[in-house]
Amino acid sequence: MGRLRFVVLLSIFPIKTFSEPCSTMALVLRDSIKISEFINLSASEKLLPSALTAVKSVRISKVDKIISYENDTLSDIDLLKGVKLVENGYVCLAGLVVTGEWNLPDNCKGGVSICLVDKRMKRANEATLGSYHTSACKKRFTFKIIPNYSVTTADALKGIWQVMTNIRGVEMEKGFCPLSLEFVSICVVYLNNIKLGLREKILNVTEGGPTELTEAVVDEFVEKVPMAARLKSFRSVNKKKPSNSSKFVNGKSRLNSRNKLNYENGDSDVGISVVDDIVVGNGVSDIRIDDDCESFDAQSDSY
């Protein structure tokens, strides 16, 4: 009876097999990652599957590895390995977990400095996303970096991240590996970059709720955007500047092409002089606005 029950349990809970080989350290590293240490998830984001989270999706990359053979190396690293990205969208590198292991005997001297680099940035201080220092006597170490910034999917596919290792004081023959590093990243992928803005505020407005969808909602959002204030200041300065479309050149009135042609042909009945947008015809008592002049001087009232 006991054997029969044991067989039934095995059929209900089959043993899971892994389709691709991976090291023990990689398994331990992936199982030790807690997304809550890097980002705060709402209750719906924790419970709903990724297909129902339209705005963003949290994903963990596969393990990528670097083997250091030299004292100073700058290596490309795939922090989005196995991560399904959104086409024409964005990816936020929320966090990075790094595990290293010294391939040395115990009580060896020396140490290493590890730095995560964004190779798009030209200034060294801006390209450095985080660094870590440890000694060789610490056989295995783990640390995390929280870059917490977003890039476009197109940029991310170009492999923009690197890892710089600087090993010092380790006496080893060339051609051997003193240090191994493994990386796992936590990413947030999403299609729209507007996560906390006007769109979300309007969508959250409900009938009878505390916020009404009025013009004040839009004005409140626009006032919080710094560029809106800069644009307002820029336009106010330009309005104070004198217009370049003056009717006088060197103190003389400027005739449009049609009136100039009539004047040169000696047609005095239709000769017209233009003074401050007021057109006066010879022998005509009324004041008219010339169509060509009006269309030439009209200023657009749209910004």
From Swiss-Prot:
Short name of one Pfam family: MP
GO molecular function, one term: RNA binding
Its biological purpose: Transports viral genome to neighboring plant cells directly through plasmosdesmata, without any budding. The movement protein allows efficient cell to cell propagation, by bypassing the host cell wall barrier. Forms a ribonucleoprotein complex with viral RNA. Binds microtubules and modulates microtubule stability. Can bind double-stranded DNA.
Organism lineage: Viruses, Riboviria, Orthornavirae, Kitrinoviricota, Alsuviricetes
Membrane-spanning residues: none
GO cellular component terms, semicolon-separated: host cell cytoplasm; host cell plasmodesma; host cytoskeleton
Highest taxon of the lineage: Viruses
Protein name per UniProt: Movement protein
InterPro entries reported in the protein's UniProt record: TMV_movement, Viral_movement
Alphabetic keyword roster: Host cell junction, Host cytoplasm, Host cytoskeleton, RNA-binding, Transport, Viral movement protein
Organism: Odontoglossum ringspot virus (isolate Japan)
